[in-house]
């Protein structure tokens, strides 16, 4: 593969890049779907089984090109058994960061997610950088934040 220098016109910085997929580690696909689809209202984009695995993606209706892959922590086929064990332990301890969703109403979103029984990490609060946000844990222990610009 040819290597390009930073000043080369074919440099990535000159290209228009967009987020397509991001991954959230989960313990169980169905549990994760119950949260991301049923509580947060994300649409299921893919739910396909192949080679004994399951490929599940969800995303916001307003962002059809952005997909969140719900992937078991130990699913990476290139991971060693030790790596899989460590990933599973980090997930169980809530140490894997996840996602921040933008919302028009942080307080209303907070109330809806609370009513669904999600574990609250932070009630809505204003920050000096012009954002009001709140935080929860999803069923797998990932932090999920809801942010509203002020």
Regions found by a protein language model. Name each.
Residues 2-23, 43-137, 147-150:
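Vicinal oxygen chelate
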Residues 31-32, 108:
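Short Gly/charged-rich anion-binding patches and loops
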Residues 32-37, 113, 138-141:
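Conserved active-site tyrosine of GNAT-family acetyltransferases
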């Amino acid at each position: 593969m040819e290597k390009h220098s930073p000043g080369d016109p074919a440099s990535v910085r000159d290209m228009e890049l967009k987020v397509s997929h991001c991954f959230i580690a989960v313990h169980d696909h169905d549990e994760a779907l119950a949260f991301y689809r049923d509580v947060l209202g994300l649409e299921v984009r893919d739910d396909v089984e192949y080679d004994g695995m399951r490929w599940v993606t969800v995303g916001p209706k307003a962002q059809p090109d952005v997909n969140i892959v719900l992937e078991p922590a130990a699913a990476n086929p290139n991971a060693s058994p030790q790596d899989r064990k460590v990933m599973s332990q980090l997930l169980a301890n809530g140490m894997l960061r996840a996602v921040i969703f933008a919302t028009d109403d942080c307080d209303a979103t907070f109330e809806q997610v609370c009513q669904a029984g999600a574990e609250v990490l932070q009630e809505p609060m204003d920050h000096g950088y012009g954002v009001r946000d709140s935080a929860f844990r999803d069923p797998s222990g990932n932090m999920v934040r809801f942010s509203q610009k002020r």
